[in-house]
Amino acid sequence: MTTNIHDQRILILDFGSQYTQLVARRIREIGVYCELWSWDVEESDIRDFNPDGIILSGGPESVTEENSPRAPQYVFDSGVPVFGVCYGMQTMAEQLGGKVATSTEREFGYAAVQVTGESALFKDLEATQDVWMSHGDKVVEIPSDFVKIAETETCPYAVMANEEKKYYGVQFHPEVTHTKNGMKMLENFVLNVCGCEGLWTSASIIEDAVARIKEQVGDDEVILGLSGGVDSSVVAMLAHRAIGDKLTCVFVDNGLLRLNEADQVMEMFGNKFGLNIIHVNAEQRFLDALEGESDPEVKRKIIGHVFVDIFDEESKKLKNAKWLAQGTIYPDVIESAASKTGKAHVIKSHHNVGGLPDDMEMGLVEPLRELFKDEVRKIGLELGLPYNMLYRHPFPGPGLGVRVLGEIKKEYCDLLRRADAIFIEELHNADLYNKVSQAFTVFLPVRSVGVMGDGRKYDWVVSLRAVETIDFMTAHWAHLPYDFLGKVSNRIINEVNGISRVVYDISGKPPATIEWE
């Protein structure tokens, strides 16, 4: 009998912390399904979801302010374990009879927590814990039926608990890696306190997704826009495992891909894995549509519209295709729901977040819509996709369309492709590729004087860009070794005829963005 991987579940109520999605990812890593909802969810929705435990996230607001967010009262009436993190602890304390005050000694950064009481949360952990704090308010009086579990030098109630009701509050962030044993604390809550078993594994996710696709589409045919990126590639493998030749992939070569990328996609999915692929070489069509346009936002829209037109044309040739498969992932669902309603809710609502036309009259197959990116990569490995493809640096949807600054020309794209390939190759050779979060080359539409042999040349400029980041919301420029940068520059100038100068971008985000356009 197939295990229902959704049988055990944790509900995370989002109070606005930048770390909330990280909490959800940690719960998934423990092997338990969870969903992320807005803090002001209806009681009936919580009842229907029937969680085994509830986590109250951190947030930027102050419990001491009037009209600041509060957990629904049903959270504390439901009888399930509750874990409050930072703001979540503070609202729990205040709602259950304790007191919160704005502290004169704010805690941001590392802190040493001294465990002074017994708690299931600290099972198998030592009495001193290094944790990550980020708070201005603090609990100054705990509810009468709670006990103090831990403290820091400036925070008298760093952890509180009502072991009988299985309520726990921590003033620090267990979800971040800076809290050394934070994962163990979350495991103690999810596995020991809530009684979950860890049914959410890569193998079980694949089994569930394949079964769902089979049940959803029956004997119908399915069409998928295959880009060669992580999400569409994993969807292709799942759908092919579920329905075989009833899946048709459309791969559009827009002329804005990386060096040899189109050949690599066709070789892997067509020859190696045996998928049905329609290969549309549309380079000239995209270049014609982009001719004379230099505004980056307009370029993005043109590229998107041309792709949709081509995909629509190809789908109409497949008379029996009743379903459209998409690589929608959970963060897309959260963002799409929030943009429509102001709330991160609910995973079952079907938002078409892929930008394809509403009049295609096809049902949506979205086997990844419950998954975070790291989960998608893990199941991709399990499905046999190569590591270097799944863990490749991010590549923008419009491709080189936003890495060639200004107007797009074939000459510029060809030069950029070759220069970028050299940069990436040398990063691999120097064992630096996996030490930076993203690296790429940008084509600048300016000419610069150079010297080659006894002659002068007046050719184009490219910029190398490499950044280090955790979440891509902020980023530092990567301090690559000078001799490495020198080698890359020399190779590009000597091997790519048409480029006379290479520069290195040392801008952080903010104020700059990671991509130039």
Curated annotation (Swiss-Prot):
Coiled-coil features, chain-numbered ranges: none
Keywords assigned: ATP-binding, Glutamine amidotransferase, GMP biosynthesis, Ligase, Nucleotide-binding, Purine biosynthesis
InterPro entries for the chain: Class_I_gatase-like (IPR029062), GATASE (IPR017926), GMP_synth_C (IPR001674), GMP_synth_GATase (IPR004739), GMP_synthase (IPR022955), GMPS_ATP_PPase_dom (IPR025777), NAD/GMP_synthase (IPR022310), Rossmann-like_a/b/a_fold (IPR014729)
The keyword Ligase is annotated on this UniProt entry: yes
Biological or metabolic pathway of the protein: Purine metabolism; GMP biosynthesis; GMP from XMP (L-Gln route): step 1/1
Reaction(s) catalysed (UniProt annotation): XMP + L-glutamine + ATP + H2O = GMP + L-glutamate + AMP + diphosphate + 2 H(+)
Domain (Glutamine amidotransferase type-1): residue spans on this chain: 9-199
GO terms under cellular component: cytosol
Keyword ATP-binding: yes
Catalytic residues (UniProt): 86, 173, 175
GO molecular-function terms, A-Z: ATP binding; GMP synthase activity
EC number: 6.3.5.2
EC class of the enzyme, as a word: ligase
PROSITE patterns: GATASE_TYPE_1, GMPS_ATP_PPASE
Gene3D superfamilies according to UniProt: 3.30.300.10, 3.40.50.880, HUPs
Ranges for domain GMPS ATP-PPase: 200-392
Protein function: Catalyzes the synthesis of GMP from XMP.
NCBIfam families: guaA_Cterm, guaA_Nterm, PRK00074.1
Subunit architecture: Homodimer.
Protein name: GMP synthase [glutamine-hydrolyzing]
